[in-house]
């Protein structure tokens, strides 16, 4: 992409970001709430336009690694074993989808984004379904035009989109008492990538405790079926495959505290190595502690949607490893809950993504790298701000961050012991 074209696209994305912010927090524009058909048409049009502009500029993980997983499936090979280490560390749900996408005969940079695009349209519907009824149409519109989903889904083509859609659908099913369906959807979400396990506490929060065993039993079915399919369809050596499956790591040294440590010369950058492994372990411990604290402190005070958003924000605050697509995780949930603090995160995270995809990624530089690291500190501060601290006050009413609709109460108001 030439400099002039990049500047034009940057201007367009800034305009979209301004529109999203305008329709969320500014005066009469906050009332903009088109019908679902109009919102979906705009969402589809924007995503197709970004896909077209991004053609030949798709990041290498989707352009190369994800394509390789589909090719491996078509050759009856296990992507866990034939791809280089850290390029694929998940169950074969998406490689099966990638194989189907390759079979369409479309150029991969189009075909590989079909599933994420369709999933993101489902998310556009679900954010309205999970929001308060009077806010449903407005929240759908805000998600449809927000630049962060546009970039992660249509520019990057990341599989966060189906994971988010399935996780939201699991919350929707649990809220409506469809326990078995909620468990199956949760299991499918975890089958796409590992991180949607963060939806599990929220699903349980919306489910009466006597039905928790049903959630667990149905949630394990999709992963077990996928594991059973691997030796049959992919000729997997299950011992080796399971070791690779359990070795996933995020890219360390580019975000938050590990990014600052790398700039100071104390940490390397990447997925593994002598200057990375200790910090990966520290990051894992920090994540587990942070998630545990969120559940212990906020369980009786939040709905399933709010609890899930808090868990994702806490993860982003303390994680050692990071990918730009992680920023998408809490976006739909924060739009559902609403509030100005949520929009501080939604705005800064969008700015980070615009800079990463449209400035840093096409032409990496030391200066841009430093901007991203220090910019991550601002996004982390926004994530901390977006946590529902006001709920810690005795007898606090839902206000500020929370404006989401609460379903009829369940029997889960006490701490899960």
Task: List the predicted regions and their residue ranges.
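Multi-pass membrane glycosyltransferase architecture that uses lipid-linked
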Residues: 1-244, 248-250, 280-417
């Amino acid at each position: 992409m030439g400099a002039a074209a990049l500047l034009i696209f940057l201007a367009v994305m800034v305009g979209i970001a301004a529109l999203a912010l305008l329709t969320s927090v500014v005066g009469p524009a906050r009332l903009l709430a088109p019908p679902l058909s109009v919102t979906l048409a705009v969402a589809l049009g924007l995503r197709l336009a970004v896909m077209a502009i991004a053609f030949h500029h798709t990041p290498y993980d989707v352009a190369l690694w994800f394509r390789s997983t589909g090719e491996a499936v078509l050759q009856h090979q296990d992507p866990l074993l034939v791809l280089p280490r850290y390029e694929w560390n998940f169950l074969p749900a998406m490689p099966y989808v990638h194989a189907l996408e390759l079979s369409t005969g479309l150029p991969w940079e189009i075909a590989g984004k079909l599933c994420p695009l369709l999933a993101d349209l489902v998310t556009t519907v679900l954010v309205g379904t999970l929001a308060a009824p009077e806010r449903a149409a407005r929240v759908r519109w805000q998600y449809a035009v927000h630049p962060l989903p546009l970039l992660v889904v249509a520019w990057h083509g990341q599989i966060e989109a189906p994971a988010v859609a399935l996780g939201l659908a699991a919350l929707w099913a649990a809220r409506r008492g469809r326990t078995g369906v909620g468990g199956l959807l949760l299991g499918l979400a975890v089958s796409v990538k590992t991180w949607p396990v963060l939806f599990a506490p929220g699903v349980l929060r919306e489910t009466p405790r006597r039905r928790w065993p049903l959630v667990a039993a149905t949630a394990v079915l999709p992963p077990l079926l996928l594991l059973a399919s691997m030796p049959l369809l992919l000729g997997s050596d299950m011992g080796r495959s399971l070791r690779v499956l359990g070795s996933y790591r995020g890219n360390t040294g580019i975000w938050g505290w590990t990014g600052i440590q790398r700039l100071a010369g104390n940490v390397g950058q990447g997925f593994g190595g002598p200057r990375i492994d200790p910090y990966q372990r520290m990051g894992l411990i920090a994540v587990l502690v942070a998630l545990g604290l969120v559940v212990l402190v906020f369980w009786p005070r939040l709905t399933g949607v709010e609890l899930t958003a808090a868990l994702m924000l806490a993860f982003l605050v303390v994680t050692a490893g990071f990918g730009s697509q992680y920023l998408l995780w809490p976006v739909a949930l924060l739009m559902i809950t609403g509030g100005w603090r949520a929009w501080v995160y939604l705005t800064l995270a969008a700015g980070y993504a615009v800079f990463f995809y449209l400035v840093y990624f096409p032409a990496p530089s030391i200066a841009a790298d430093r901007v991203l690291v220090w910019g991550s500190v601002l996004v982390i501060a926004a994530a901390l701000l977006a946590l529902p601290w006001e709920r810690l006050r005795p007898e606090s009413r839902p206000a500020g961050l929370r404006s989401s609709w609460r379903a009829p109460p369940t029997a889960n108001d006490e701490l899960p012991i």
